[in-house]
Amino acid sequence: MADDGMLMNFEIGEVPIVTKQSFKGGRWKDRLAAKKTAQHRVSRSTSKPSTREIFSERQHDTGAEEYIGREPSLRAPKRQRVDDNYDSYGGRNESTAAYASGKLPSGSINLGRGRKTTFQEETRPAFVAGKLPPGSINISGKKATPIQEETRPAFVSGKLPPGSINSGARKAISFQEEKKPAYISGKLPHGSIDGMRNREMAAVHREIAEGGRKPGQVVSSLFTFNPTSKKKFDEPEEESEPAKPSNAPLTEEMATFTNLGLSRRLAAHLSTKLDMKAPTAIQKASVTQLISDDSDAFIQAETGSGKTLAYLLPIVERILALSDNGIQIHRDSGLFAIILSPTRELCKQIAAVLEKVLRCAPWIVGTTVNGGESKQSEKARLRKGVNILVATPGRLADHLDNTEVLNVATVRWLVLDEGDRLMELGFEEEIKGIVEKIGRRSVASGSSEMMSLPKRRVTILCSATMKMNVQRLGEISLKDAVHIQADPSEQEKQDKANGIEADDKAFSAPTQLKQSYAIVPAKLRLVTLTALLKRAFARKGSVMKAIVFMSCADSVDFHFSLFSRSAEKSAEASEEGKVDPPTLPKSELIKETITHGATISNNSNPVILHKLHGSLAQNIRTATLKAYSESADPCVLICTDVASRGLDLPNVDFVIEYDPPFSAEDHLHRVGRTARAGREGRALIFLMPGTEEEYVSILASGYREGRKALTHHTAEDLIQKGFGGTGREWEERATNFQLEVERWSLDSPRYLEMARRGFQSHIRAYATHVANERHIFNMQELHLGHLAKAFALRDKPGSIKVPGLRPAKMTKADRSVAARKAKRGEKEEEKAPEGERVRKQRKMELDLPTVDSNEVAARMKRKMKEHMSAASEFNIG
């Protein structure tokens, strides 16, 4: 080529000009890692003969041509032109070679001296092969290409399981050996671990291929990149003989109600009408003390041992004694006893027990006053007269201040049930005021007619977890109190004889309770809970009733909707057949809180699902609890801690603590819903690998045998038993269930909103554990991405934002409108409930002036046209 004689003030070197690699997309850490990996491959590829000899020789052998110009120096030799297709890895691709020579076959390059070098297929870099799938690393705006199967890195092939390092357009990156993994080759036998991974990944990739993943979402694998347990737990020893129940009624030979000092009328009523043949140990100790003595008392006993009757029977017996003395007692004879309970549910339950006891003496009247009910109707009942009053502290304090008909001058008993819970809920000031007002208004009993009643007000404090060193509540209410507890067991007597003192800090659980714990990674929580419930209700009659405790109301709502999905939409419906729904109670109140649990039911054993939390209206909570207690079909109650205190729910066989309790005392009350009155029961708590495993030692402190009384489970064991199948088919079934739930959540804005609210509320609740347990439940240890998968979410945790607060409670008017729509056959909108902030914003926007958007757009268009038009005589200033 002849020299054109152009003078240049710069010199171009001999090194070929190559395109600069530009890594785009993904996080900067992923781009940096990919860049370093590419550079490493360059250094390896240039060391091979097939690529090294491309640059080992001069690209041009032409000599220095004669230079005509001002400078005496020779012009630099010409370099061969290299277009954008020239690769920095030491060669061109097929299209470049063909462009240069026009005659060479695909894969060869003309080096300028007649030599022809062909790339080896095994060593060609990925960016030369031109076969990478869309979404891999983008270089210089060109489409990237994959390497051959045998040698291409895992991060290029794009077949690593989701959950590894994410790069570019969310293709997984993992720096592995350049050999194709076994689970990609697909040649492993069925049932092996890698074969299972292949099937699981096939399900995930099939979900992506079918359009199940939307932009900004992540479909991750269930069984990869899960943290493992850091501690090794010993297997419990098999019991040689079953444990003796610690809260069972005594035998008739040991004690009867008549031997405790109760009248024949009351003792016969208990044995015939209430089917109570003998008292429990705590009832034996408290009834004799409270009948014969007028001292304050502190009753301490484990949960489910009958504390309610322990204080009700002495009160009723001493009031009945007035009638035996010839005094006619009726409802306006005066208020003799006030019983305070921390929650409305416990208040209703105490009133129900009292009503059964008073059937033998219908002239003694008891009633309740608590929040959530009409004050006018309560005032009407108080005006007629009442002898025993069961109340919550807040409502009783309100009536003492504002209701003149409430006369407390004749009060002789003040009972504080669940005293520790009263203090935890912040009722200290109310209790102080109640005690002071009753003390000022009470009159000493000096009449000979009232000899059977205490001469002074007796205060009784009851709790399962109350410690002897609790002083605040004792200073408020108790004076020279007597400590009443059940007779110590033989083991405790032996320990005391040997000089071993009991640990005051340890809480007490019934000995017949079978407690276990499961170490479950965050990603597997949902499928493990599902498998556990499926296994529990697999056979009819194996489990009648179960309770699942969760930390917040939003989580309860989400899981209630999830487990009550229609059976036709279930992936297993085609295999197991259609499940016949059980008969549900017909009531408008409980229409939203009771449904058929299609997800955990089967043909032979349909399950009824209930939900309960504090955000429900009081009448709905009461009706739901009543339906759950009276149901003869298998039931599951999903609830918060509102159902953990004092409620006597019959035939509860299994308690699942899906979210750990906020304190050890809360754990005791939760598991106390089962194994009551000498019956057997099971309890299982979910813990995550890591710091939460330290909670096992706290659980063990509630048992005399320590960790020997606890059973350890893994998530894999529970999932395998729940989903079944041959080999490792259970993992594929669990993966399909998880993907199905995620699709169900994404298909409905309502359910997606519920999942997001449940996720956020769960994280907020996780941060509220008591101070001395926060090192165990550490917020910094939570993997939010894995936890989001347990709520069927595919969003990144940082993008999960729910505006506003929880939806407002449904009023009577709202329920009436919903009932009318249901009668007309109108379906509810698939719309997420609005938060408080959204409603306020909408209210504010009502005051803004209305603006026509079309007019604004037209005005803006005219303004832009005016500024962009050419100069004319009309717009030149």
Curated annotation (Swiss-Prot):
EC main group: hydrolase
Motif (Q motif): 255-284
Domain Helicase C-terminal: 512-719
Compositionally biased residues, Basic and acidic residues: 50-73, 825-846
Residues the entry annotates as binding ATP: 301-308
Segments for region (Disordered): 34-163, 225-251, 803-851
One Gene Ontology MF term: ATP binding
Enzyme nomenclature, EC number: 3.6.4.13
Lipoprotein found in the keyword field: no
Disulfide cross-links: none
Localization per Swiss-Prot or TrEMBL: Nucleus, Nucleolus
Domain called Helicase ATP-binding: residue spans: 288-484
Catalytic activity: ATP + H2O = ADP + phosphate + H(+)
The record's note on its domains: The Q motif is unique to and characteristic of the DEAD box family of RNA helicases and controls ATP binding and hydrolysis.
Function of the protein: ATP-binding RNA helicase involved in the biogenesis of 60S ribosomal subunits and is required for the normal formation of 25S and 5.8S rRNAs.
Name under which the protein is recorded: ATP-dependent RNA helicase dbp7
Gene designation: dbp7
